[in-house]
């Protein structure tokens, strides 16, 4: 397990940490900064903050949360949700984020990946992919926290995202998310085999044995 990074993902709505199943039925869990510090104390290697409604309402509201966390937590922080421009990315990086994750805006304008990578480096750009299994055994790219269909194939999009300059991929299985029934290993293997950048598996983790 020496090469495995344990990354705590915190989904945010307004000022609250929330949790759901399949990105639906979201309920308030507590204060995101308190949970971030707890995960840090427990040995998390990184943190990911995702604003679950930012793309829907066209805004990013995580600046203050990120500032507070960055003052108390000394591991890399990735922030996503509602990032639509280089300026949006810069604002979050200035607040203390180490990386920004983009999803919805990148599917509409893939050159945003390149623009942010040129300005801050590929190591700062995470392509967030929300994947939903289809009837033909493939996976479709979803956006807006799993609300909207794109018709895009996940594996193809991951390859294109790398070409545009993404330094990592955050791969969330909507079908497994929140279930604690294990990762979609087939999905993770398919994407990982087609790109040379790190792939972060998200959705379904329930016990430590799943890292083996």
Curated annotation (Swiss-Prot):
Gene Ontology CC terms: cytoplasm
Superkingdom: Bacteria
Subcellular location field: Cytoplasm
Keyword annotations of the record: Amino-acid biosynthesis, Cytoplasm, Histidine biosynthesis, Lyase
Ligase listed as a keyword: no
Reactions catalysed, as given in the entry: 5-[(5-phospho-1-deoxy-D-ribulos-1-ylimino)methylamino]-1-(5-phospho-beta-D-ribosyl)imidazole-4-carboxamide + L-glutamine = D-erythro-1-(imidazol-4-yl)glycerol 3-phosphate + 5-amino-1-(5-phospho-beta-D-ribosyl)imidazole-4-carboxamide + L-glutamate + H(+)
PANTHER family given in the database record: IMIDAZOLE GLYCEROL PHOSPHATE SYNTHASE HISHF, IMIDAZOLE GLYCEROL PHOSPHATE SYNTHASE SUBUNIT HISF/H IGP SYNTHASE SUBUNIT HISF/H
Quaternary structure and partners: Heterodimer of HisH and HisF.
Protein name: Imidazole glycerol phosphate synthase subunit HisF
Organism (species): Legionella pneumophila
Encoding gene, per UniProt annotation: hisF
């Amino acid at each position: 397990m020496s090469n495995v990074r344990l990354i705590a993902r915190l989904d945010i709505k307004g000022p609250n940490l929330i949790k759901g199943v399949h990105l639906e039925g979201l309920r308030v869990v507590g204060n995101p900064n308190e949970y971030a510090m707890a995960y840090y104390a427990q040995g998390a290697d990184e943190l990911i903050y995702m604003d679950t409604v930012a793309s829907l309402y066209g805004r990013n509201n995580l600046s203050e949360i990120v500032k507070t966390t960055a003052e108390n937590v000394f591991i890399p922080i990735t922030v996503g949700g509602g990032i639509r421009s280089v300026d949006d990315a810069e604002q979050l990086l200035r607040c203390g984020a180490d990386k920004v994750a983009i999803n919805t805006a990148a599917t509409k304008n893939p050159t945003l990946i390149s623009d942010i990578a040129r300005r801050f480096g590929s190591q700062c750009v995470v392509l967030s992919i929300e994947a939903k299994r289809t009837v033909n055994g493939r996976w479709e790219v979803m956006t807006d926290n799993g609300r909207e269909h794109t018709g895009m194939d996940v594996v193809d999009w991951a390859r294109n995202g790398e070409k545009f300059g993404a330094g990592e991929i955050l791969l969330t299985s909507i079908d497994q998310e929140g279930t604690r029934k294990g990762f979609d290993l087939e999905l993770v293997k398919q994407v990982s085999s087609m790109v040379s950048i790190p792939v972060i598996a998200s959705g379904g983790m329930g016990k430590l044995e799943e890292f083996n």
